[in-house]
C-alpha cells in the first residue's frame, strides 16, 4: 500500500481497456476485400463447417470474419462490410460480415430476424 506522499508524486495508474475488435479502430463498420473464402470446423463439443472469409480492410488490417446465415455468394475479391462481434466456437474469429450490404447478398427466403440477414420483406399473397 503506497503512502500519501508516494501517491502525490506518482499517482494511480489507470488500467487500459483492451479492445475486443482492434482492427475496427473505433469504427462501427469497416469495408474490406475478401482475400480467401473457406470453411472451418468449430471447437469441441460442436461440429459443423462454418463459413468464414479472410478480409483485408481499408486500414490495412487482415482479419478473419464470419459469414452468417444459410448460403452466400462471396468469392475472392468480393467487397464486404465488416462489423465487430466474435464467434464463440471459432478461435480467432472476432468479426462478422454484414449481410445485404455491398457485394454480399441477403439470405434468400428468410422470414424471421430478416434485418440481421439483409432479407427484404416477402410479398404478401
Swiss-Prot record:
Source species of the chain: Polaromonas naphthalenivorans (strain CJ2)
User: Which keywords does this Swiss-Prot/TrEMBL entry list?
Assistant: Methylation, Ribonucleoprotein, Ribosomal protein, RNA-binding, rRNA-binding, tRNA-binding
Keyword tRNA-binding among UniProt keywords: yes
Question: Which stretches does the entry tag as region Disordered?
Answer: 9-31, 105-125
Protein name, per record: Small ribosomal subunit protein uS12
Q: Which residues form a coiled coil?
A: none
Show the NCBIfam families listed in the entry: rpsL_bact (TIGR00981)
From which lineage does this chain's organism come? Bacteria, Pseudomonadati, Pseudomonadota, Betaproteobacteria, Burkholderiales
Q: Any keyword Glycoprotein?
A: no
